[in-house]
């Protein structure tokens, strides 16, 4: 596995990391995953990489230029902007195919063919089907905890069964996601399909998301829907918080940087080129997000800690932008959740006294829908804020004042930021689902579980958007590394000046 | 329903740094005036719906660019995908008025092959006592470039609505007359979603009548 070179190396490395993650859970389990996964994932991967360069239906001059250079780059190093997209996508794709098999892919297929984002009930019913299809396999594996499959099977069990004890299973799954955000990219059904579609259609992430949003718009305007209905459409909300625009702007910076980096590489030769390539290689390593298996850090942290952690990480980046908007949005979300159970419990009690049963369900039904709507809104807002931060960081890395921090240090910090953000999203989604469970205690599972599933799905989508946006920063930091190299003599002069004055 | 609009226009706001671009946009989109604001990094985004005729809404997507020179290479890239623009100068800062030529020259180079409908905005008109640019010379300059001229104040909320809605109306007219068309791969004008058929057929009837005249 390690002996491969060229295009496949990074991809396989990624796949193996996913599998190693499985190891953290239980040895017995990951073994079974290992055996079935390896051959399939490799063939899937080879097929995909082989297929990709053929798809060149570009009308735009610019894109075709990019594509040309991409295929060239692929044969050379297998990295670069598009290359790394391929890397993360392929690995997640192959992991899913290998471990999940037909069941889940049919879910994904159907979900995509219906709408940009399928309704929660739709997903849940599909998951039910998937669960039935993959039941045999699940029994063989006899596990809920390992690999991407584990998450889904847990959730499908939750959907299938009735009674409250099941929800605990669903929450376990969400807890599990915290450790496995990398794997989750694959299962975040609509998002995964969107990103997978990106590979086939040569579209950018923002284009894909824009299309999904437009589908939602079309749908909401055709259907005579209530205002509240619109409030649960992640895509529309993400755009409302300017997430799409920031993503588009980030993509522009990323593409420009990519072109510049390439032209620099083309202009170099011999030792100079080799040293630079080596440095760029180190930078890429910082972008590989390896630290999702931290058991210790998983424990719940105080409310203040996220704000503190993110603020500190941003000060390490030495860019003038501050994550206040993000931390504010996050804290608002937490305050809201905290206020929820108390309020509804009080309401319920009063209601019970006055009306004795009957209407109480009405009250709590509104409440779980409120929580669901707020959860989706918060996830969309936090994701948009995160992407805005990445966009601002890119602009400042390229055009800010020169700082005493290397591109590699910045990459490492940004990688940590990404991990923190994704963990926070999974934690937040767990808070929301806990809240849903508490408030919807009298609900039928049929109405409660789809909402829980939807929150979980959008949380994993959010995490994958953030990780994709993070990958867009790679060319930006590559360019910054190159510029720092060439400008270092003048930089030294500037440092010496004050000394001479003394 | 709120989410429904006929078109989406992308507008760009440009001009020297500290002329008040972000404050003007915030007043328009958020209805408040921010006393202190950090310089814009690269570009920021805002959006708002504008009702140009009863029941007819346009969604404005506003790109707030950084005025600082160091971000110029970023902001240049945004002209191409805008249908309209507000070119701001500060009436208390002569230099920012003199730079209007430069801004227009720059956009001309980078907007090809499309066009942007610009309005010239003399901002901070509440500070009339510190005025360094007369209304007359600003109007003359605007006319020379075929632009409208308007004076605004974000602090006192003077003409802020008018600046944006007049520009939106002008663009809407051009779109209706077919002088600006929706194009694949261009983000300047996008078609929105019309909720019922009656609405759009009414549209067709109107434009036919227009043709006969």
UniProtKB/Swiss-Prot annotation, chain B:
Compartments (UniProt record): Cell membrane; Cytoplasmic vesicle membrane; Golgi apparatus; Cytoplasmic vesicle, Autophagosome membrane
Function comment: The small GTPases Rab are key regulators of intracellular membrane trafficking, from the formation of transport vesicles to their fusion with membranes. Rabs cycle between an inactive GDP-bound form and an active GTP-bound form that is able to recruit to membranes different sets of downstream effectors directly responsible for vesicle formation, movement, tethering and fusion. RAB39B is involved in autophagy and may function in autophagosome formation.
Domain remarks in the Swiss-Prot or TrEMBL record: Switch I, switch II and the interswitch regions are characteristic of Rab GTPases and mediate the interactions with Rab downstream effectors. The switch regions undergo conformational changes upon nucleotide binding which drive interaction with specific sets of effector proteins, with most effectors only binding to GTP-bound Rab.
Name this polypeptide is given: Ras-related protein Rab-39B
Region (Switch-II): 67-83
Region (Switch-I): 35-43
E.C. number(s) listed in UniProt: 3.6.5.2
Annotated control of activity: Regulated by guanine nucleotide exchange factors (GEFs) including C9orf72-SMCR8 complex, which promote the exchange of bound GDP for free GTP. Regulated by GTPase activating proteins (GAPs) which increase the GTP hydrolysis activity. Inhibited by GDP dissociation inhibitors (GDIs).
Alphabetized UniProt keyword annotations: Autism spectrum disorder, Autophagy, Cell membrane, Cytoplasmic vesicle, Disease variant, Golgi apparatus, GTP-binding, Hydrolase, Intellectual disability, Lipoprotein, Lysosome, Magnesium, Membrane, Metal-binding, Methylation, Nucleotide-binding, Parkinson disease, Phosphoprotein, Prenylation, Protein transport, Transport
Membrane-protein topology: Lipid-anchor
Record-listed Mg(2+) binding positions: 22, 40, 64
Lipidation (S-geranylgeranyl cysteine): 211, 213
Short name of one Pfam family: Ras
UniProt record, GO biological process: autophagy; protein transport; Rab protein signal transduction; regulation of autophagy; synapse organization; vesicle-mediated transport
Catalyzed reactions: GTP + H2O = GDP + phosphate + H(+)
Binding site for GTP: 17, 20-23, 37, 40, 67, 123-124, 126, 154-155
Cited PROSITE patterns: RAB
Self-association state and partner proteins as the record states: Interacts (GDP-bound) with C9orf72; C9orf72 in complex with SMCR8 acts as a GEF for RAB39B. Interacts (in GTP-bound form) with PICK1 (via PDZ domain); a PICK1 homodimer may allow simultaneous association of RAB39B and GRIA2 to PICK1 which is involved in GRIA2 trafficking. Interacts with isoform c of RASSF1; the interaction is strong. Interacts with isoform a of RASSF1; the interaction is weak. Interacts with the DLG4/PSD-95. Interacts (GTP-bound) with HOPS complex components VPS39 and VPS41.
Modified-residue entries (Cysteine methyl ester), positions: 213
Source species: Homo sapiens (Human)
Entry keyword GTP-binding: yes
GO terms for MF: GTP binding; GTPase activity; myosin V binding
Modified residues (Phosphoserine): 201
Cofactors required: Mg(2+)
Recorded disease: Intellectual developmental disorder, X-linked 72: A disorder characterized by significantly below average general intellectual functioning associated with impairments in adaptive behavior and manifested during the developmental period. Intellectual deficiency is the only primary symptom of non-syndromic X-linked forms, while syndromic forms present with associated physical, neurological and/or psychiatric manifestations. XLID72 patients can manifest autism spectrum disorder, seizures and macrocephaly as additional features.
Recorded GO CC terms: cytoplasmic vesicle membrane; Golgi apparatus; neuron projection; plasma membrane; vesicle
Transmembrane segments: none
């Amino acid at each position: 596995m390690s002996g491969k070179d060229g295009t496949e190396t990074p991809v396989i490395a990624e796949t193996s990391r996913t599998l190693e993650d499985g190891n953290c859970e239980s040895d017995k389990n990951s073994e079974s995953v290992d055996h079935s996964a390896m051959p399939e994932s490799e063939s899937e991967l080879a097929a995909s990489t082989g297929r990709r360069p053929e798809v060149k239906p570009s009308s735009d001059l610019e894109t075709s230029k990019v594509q040309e250079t991409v295929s060239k780059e692929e044969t050379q190093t297998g990295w670069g902007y598009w290359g790394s997209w391929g890397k993360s996508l392929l690995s997640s794709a192959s992991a899913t195919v290998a471990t999940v098999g037909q069941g889940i892919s049919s879910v994904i297929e159907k979900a995509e063919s219906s709408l940009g984002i399928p309704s929660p009930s739709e997903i849940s019913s599909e998951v039910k089907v998937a669960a039935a299809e993959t039941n045999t396999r699940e029994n063989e594996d006899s596990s809920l905890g390992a690999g991407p499959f584990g998450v889904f099977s847990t959730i499908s069990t939750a959907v299938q069964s009735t009674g409250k004890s099941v929800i605990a299973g669903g929450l376990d799954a969400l807890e599990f996601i915290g450790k496995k955000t990398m794997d989750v990219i694959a299962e975040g059904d609509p998002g995964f399909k969107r990103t997978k579609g990106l590979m086939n259609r040569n579209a950018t992430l923002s284009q894909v998301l824009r299309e999904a949003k437009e589908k939602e718009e079309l749908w909401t305007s055709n259907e005579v829907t209530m205002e509240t209905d619109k409030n649960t459409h992640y895509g529309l909300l993400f755009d409302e918080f300017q997430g799409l625009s920031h993503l588009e702007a980030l993509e522009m910076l990323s593409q420009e940087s990519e072109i510049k980096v390439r032209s620099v590489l083309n202009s170099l030769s011999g030792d100079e080129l080799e040293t630079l390539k080596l440095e760029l290689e180190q930078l890429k390593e910082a972008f590989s997000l390896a630290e999702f298996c931290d058991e210790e850090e998983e424990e719940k942290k105080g409310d203040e800690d996220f704000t503190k952690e993110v603020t500190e990480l941003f000060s390490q980046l030495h860019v003038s932008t501050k994550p206040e908007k993000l931390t504010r949005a996050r804290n608002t979300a937490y305050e809201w959740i905290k206020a929820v159970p108390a309020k509804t419990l009080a309401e319920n009690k009063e209601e019970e006294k006055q009306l004795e049963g009957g209407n109480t369900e009405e009250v709590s039904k509104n409440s779980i829908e409120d929580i669901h709507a707020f959860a989706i809104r918060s996830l969309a807002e936090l994701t948009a804020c995160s992407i805005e931060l990445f966009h601002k960081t890119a602009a400042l890395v390229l055009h800010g004042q020169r700082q005493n921090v290397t591109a590699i240090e910045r990459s490492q910090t940004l990688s940590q930021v990404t991990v923190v953000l994704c963990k926070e999203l999974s934690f937040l989604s767990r808070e929301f689902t806990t809240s849903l469970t508490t408030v919807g205690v009298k609900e039928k599972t049929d109405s409660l579980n789809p909402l829980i599933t939807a929150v979980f799905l959008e949380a994993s989508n959010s995490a994958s958007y953030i990780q994709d946006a993070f990958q867009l920063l790679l060319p930006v930091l590559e360019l910054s590394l190159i510029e720092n190299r060439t400008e270092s003599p003048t930089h030294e002069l500037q440092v010496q000046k004050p000394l001479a004055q003394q | 329903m709120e989410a429904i609009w006929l078109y989406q226009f992308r507008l760009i706001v440009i001009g020297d740094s500290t002329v008040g671009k972000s404050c003007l946009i915030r007043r328009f989109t958020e209805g408040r005036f921010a006393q202190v604001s950090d310089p814009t990094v690269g570009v920021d985004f805002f959006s708002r719906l504008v009702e140009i005729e009863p029941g007819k809404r346009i969604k404005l997507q506003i790109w707030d660019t950084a005025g600082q020179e160091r971000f110029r290479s970023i902001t240049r890239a945004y002209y191409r995908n805008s249908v309209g623009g507000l070119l701001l100068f500060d009436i208390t800062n002569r230099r920012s008025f003199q730079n209007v030529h430069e801004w227009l020259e720059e956009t001309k180079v980078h907007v090809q092959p499309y066009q942007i409908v610009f309005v010239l905005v003399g901002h901070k008109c509440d500070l009339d006592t510190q005025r360094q640019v007369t209304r007359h010379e600003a109007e003359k300059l605007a006319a020379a470039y075929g632009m409208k001229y308007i004076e605004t104040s974000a602090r006192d909320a003077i003409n802020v609505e008018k600046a944006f809605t007049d520009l939106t109306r002008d663009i809407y007219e051009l779109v209706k007359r077919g002088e600006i068309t929706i194009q694949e791969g261009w983000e300047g004008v996008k078609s929105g979603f019309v909720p019922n058929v009656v609405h759009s057929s009414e549209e067709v009837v109107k434009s036919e009548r227009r043709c006969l005249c």
